[in-house]
Amino acid sequence: MAYQSEYALENEMMNQLEQLGYERVTIRDNKQLLDNFRTILNERHADKLEGNPLTDKEFQRLLTMIDGKSIFESARILRDKLPLRRDDESEIYLSFLDTKSWCKNKFQVTNQVSVEDTYKARYDVTILINGLPLVQVELKRRGIDINEAFNQVKRYRKQNYTGLFRYIQMFIISNGVETRYFSNNDSELLKSHMFYWSDKQNNRINTLQSFAESFMRPCQLAKMISRYMIINETDRILMAMRPYQVYAVEALIQQATETGNNGYVWHTTGSGKTLTSFKASQILSQQDDIKKVIFLVDRKDLDSQTEEEFNKFAKGAVDKTFNTSQLVRQLNDKSLPLIVTTIQKMAKAIQGNAHLLEQYKTNKVVFIIDECHRSQFGDMHRLVKQHFKNAQYFGFTGTPRFPENSSQDGRTTADIFGRCLHTYLIRDAIHDGNVLGFSVDYINTFKNKALKAEDNSMVEAIDTEEVWLADKRVELVTRHIINNHDKYTRNRQYSSIFTVQSIHALIKYYETFKRLNKKLEQPLTVAGIFTFKPNEDDRDGEVPYHSREKLEIMISDYNKKFETNFSTDTTNEYFNHISKNVKKGVKDSKIDILIVVNMFLTGFDSKVLNTLYVDKNLMYHDLIQAYSRTNRVEKESKPFGKIVNYRDLKKETDDALRVFSQTNDTDTILMRSYEEYKKEFIDAYRELKMIVPTPHMVDDIQDEEELKRFVEAYRLLAKIILRLKAFDEFEFTIDEIGMDEQENEDYKSKYLAVYDQVKRATAEKNKVSILNDIDFEIEMMRNDTINVNYIMNILRQIDLEDKAEQRRNQEQIRRILDHADDPTLRLKRDLIREFIDNVVPSLNKDDDIDQEYVNFESIKKEAEFKGFAGERSIDEQALKTISNDYQYSGVVNPHHLKKMIGDLPLKEKRKARKAIESFVAETTEKYGV
C-alpha cells in the first residue's frame, strides 16, 4: 500500500472536522482572518451593539488593545471581558470565549492560511473559535518522525506566529499514526510537554482519526481550553492537563455532585497529582450547593514547594495561616469558597473553636486530601469527621494501602475512602513518558550472602546494626559511591540522595565521606539532614554524643560551603535551603549527595536528581516513594532513575512493583538487562556502518536524504550508549561491543558538524531543508566535564617557560577542541585555537593567561562588530546597544532594530533583520561566557 501524502492526510482531517460540526471556511491570509473575526464578534455581541456593528475605528481600537501581546497575556485576554469605548463615548464589554457554556461558541476550521512576516509560512489546519485561531494542527505524512512536526511548530512560532495567531492556545501534531497535543507558550517549547490523549482506561489514542473523534469534537475542545488549561501566574505560562488528570477530575466532580459518597484517586507518584487535586478543588468550589471546599495536606507537606505549586495554579490560593483563629475566620468567610490548610491545624481548630463552626454540622463541605495515605490514618481524621456531618472526603495517593501494606490499624485506603474513582499506574506513566523507569543495581557488601536486618537465620546473638555499620563496611560502601558517582550522575550533571537506616548511620556515613573527600582532586559536596529529639535516648551510653551536636557540625560545614548562616535553631530554613539546592542544575553550586533517613523521600520533586543510594530496608509504598524521587522527566541525558541498593532488596522491589503496577510483568518499569542493550547496540552499529562505513565518509554525503539517514542512525546509537554506560560491566572497547570510544567520538564529531551546518544554514538562508526540523537531541551528546571552564583550566596550566611542554599542552587542547560537544565551547573553538596558536607562544611566565585571554576576546569581539557593521552599512554603536539589551533580556529590541535598518525595500528589510538577529544571538553566546 502506498503511503498517504501530507495533502491527503490534511484533506481527510478537514472532512472529518466538518462532519464533527465545524464550519469549513476559506481563509487564505491575515486580512481575511481579521474580517472573519470582526464578523463573528459583531454576531456574538449583537444585543450589546444594539444593531450598530463595530465601526472601523472601533475595531481598530480593539485590535490595538488585543494585538501585539505575549502569548501569556493573550491567554488572559481570551478568558476575560474587555471594555471597549465606542465612538459615541459609551462603553461595552466584549468577551472572546464562553468558558462555561462550551457549546455556545462558534467553531470553524480552515487550512493553508498563508502569512508573510520575517519568513513566509503556510499553516496546515487552523481551528477558529469565535474567529480566533485557538488551535493549530501541523501534519507530517506517515513514516515521518513526529518530532519533525514539533520542531516545525517551534520554527513557525519563533518566526511567524504574530497578530491573532498569538491567541493559539494549543498545538496538535500528527503523522497520521501518532498524535500529540501541547500548550503554546512564550518560553521554549519542550518535548516533555507533548502529551498523548487516551481513554479512561489509559489506552492511548494514537491515530489522527481516533484522536479527532475523541479530543476535537467542538464542545470537548472548548471544554479542554476553558476548564483544563491552566494559566500559571508564577511562571507566566499556559499548562495543558493530561488525559488521566482530566478523567480523574471529571469522575471526582460527578461523585461529589451526583452522590453523597466518598472516593479516592490513585495516580502514581510524579504524575502531577497536586495539579489534578487542586483543579478538582477549584471546580467544586464554584458549585452553589457546596459551601466550602477544604484542601487538606499533611503538615510536613505544606512547605515552600507546596505553597509555590498551589499559588502557580491560582494566585493567592494559599493564605498561610499561623494560628487556628485565622483558620476559623477563613472558614466563616463566605467570600473564600476554597481553603488550603493542614489536617493538624483543622483538628486543632475544631477542638478549640467548635462553637464557632456550628454551621458546618449541616452545610455541605468537600474535603480534598492530598497524599491521603500519610495524613488520614489517625485520630485527627476521626475528629474532623465527627464535626463535619455533611461532608464528603476525596483522597489522592500515588501509593494506596492494600491488605499487604495496610496501615498500623489494619485499614486500607478503600476502607477509609470507598471506591477508587480513577487509576493511573506507574506502568502507564512510564509508557506515556510522564515519568522515567528505573535502573536498579544490588551491590552485595558481604562475602557470603546479603544480610537482612530481620534475618534470624544468622547467629541469633548477632547485632545486625553493628554488622551493617561496621567500619569496614561503611568505608566499602562510601568508596563504592565515590568511585561510581560521576558515572551514575553523568559527571555530576545530576544530584543524588543517600538514604540510610538511622541517624547514627547517617552521622557515621557523613563523617566517612568527609574523611575520604579530603583525598579527592574534585571533592564531592555532601550534606546531611535529620530531625533530632531534645531528650534523646543514649542507648545505655553506647553513643557518646547527642545527635544535635553532630547536626550542628553538618550545618556548619554547609554554611562554609554555601556562605549561609544556619544553625540547629533554624532547621526549617536549613531544610528549605537544601530543598532548593538539590533542585539546582549542573551550572549552579549544588549538593552532590544528600544523606537522609526519611526526609526528602516523599513529596520532594527535583528533575536534576537522578540517583538514589540505599542502605536501609524498604518495602511497598516506602520503597516506591523513595525510588520515585529519581524518575522525574528532564531531558535526553536522563533516560531513567538510577537506584543503587547496598542491601538485597530484589524481592521487596519486585513485590512493590507488582502491587503498584497491578502486574507481574515488571519489564516495563525496570531497565532491560545489559545483554539486551548490548545486542541492540550491535544491531544499531551494523546499521550505521551500512550507511557510512567510516566517520570521514560523512563528509562525502551529498544527498540530504542520505545525510538524514546518518543522523537518525547515529542518534539511535548514542541513545543506546547512554543506557549501556549505566551498567558496571560496560567497557567501551572493540572486544566488548565492537566499537571503541575513539570511533564513537569521531562519528559524534561528524554528527555535531551536520548539526552546526543545519543551524547555520537555517539562520543564513530562507531555505527549507528536510534537515531543518530533524531532532538532533543535542543534550544527549554533551559531556559536561568538557566545557569552556574545563578548557580554561588547562590554559591556566600551560607552562610558559618550557616550550616543549607548552607545545604538548597546545596539542592536547587542539585534540579536545576537535571533539568538543558542548555548544558554547564549539562556538569558541576557533577563538581558542587562534589564542593558543598566535598569543600563547609570545607570553612569558609573568603574564596572566586569564587576563590575556579576556583581552584577546575583547579585541576579537570589537573587530567582529566593526566588520559586520561595515559590511551591512549600519551604525556600530547602535548594533552594540542592541547586543547589550539582548544579553540581559534575551530579546532583540524591535524598536531599536527598526530604527537601525531604516527605510529599505520589504525583501531587503526582512533579510537585514534576520542577519542582525542571528549575529546578535551568536556573538552573545560566543562572547558571553
Curated annotation (Swiss-Prot):
Top-rank taxon: Bacteria
Catalytic activity as recorded in UniProt: Endonucleolytic cleavage of DNA to give random double-stranded fragments with terminal 5'-phosphates, ATP is simultaneously hydrolyzed
Chain positions recorded as ATP binding sites: 268-274
EC number(s) reported in the record: 3.1.21.3
PROSITE patterns per the UniProt record, alphabetical: HELICASE_ATP_BIND_1
GO MF annotations in UniProt: ATP binding; DNA binding; type I site-specific deoxyribonuclease activity
Key words of the record: ATP-binding, DNA-binding, Endonuclease, Hydrolase, Nuclease, Nucleotide-binding, Restriction system
GO terms under biological process: DNA restriction-modification system
InterPro entries the record matches: Helicase_ATP-bd, HsdR_RecA-like_helicase_dom_2, P-loop_NTPase, Restrct_endonuc_type1_HsdR_N, Restrct_endonuc_typeI_HsdR, SWI2_SNF2, Type-I_R_enzyme_R_subunit, TypeI_RM_Rsu_C
SUBUNIT field: The type I restriction/modification system is composed of three polypeptides R, M and S.
Described function: The restriction (R) subunit of a type I restriction enzyme that recognizes an undetermined sequence and cleaves a random distance away. Subunit R is required for both nuclease and ATPase activities, but not for modification. After locating a non-methylated recognition site, the enzyme complex serves as a molecular motor that translocates DNA in an ATP-dependent manner until a collision occurs that triggers cleavage.
Family of this protein: Belongs to the HsdR family.
Something else known: Type I restriction and modification enzymes are complex, multifunctional systems which require ATP, S-adenosyl methionine and magnesium as cofactors and, in addition to their endonucleolytic and methylase activities, are potent DNA-dependent ATPases.
Name of this chain's protein: Type I restriction enzyme SauMRSORF196P endonuclease subunit
UniProt gene name: hsdR
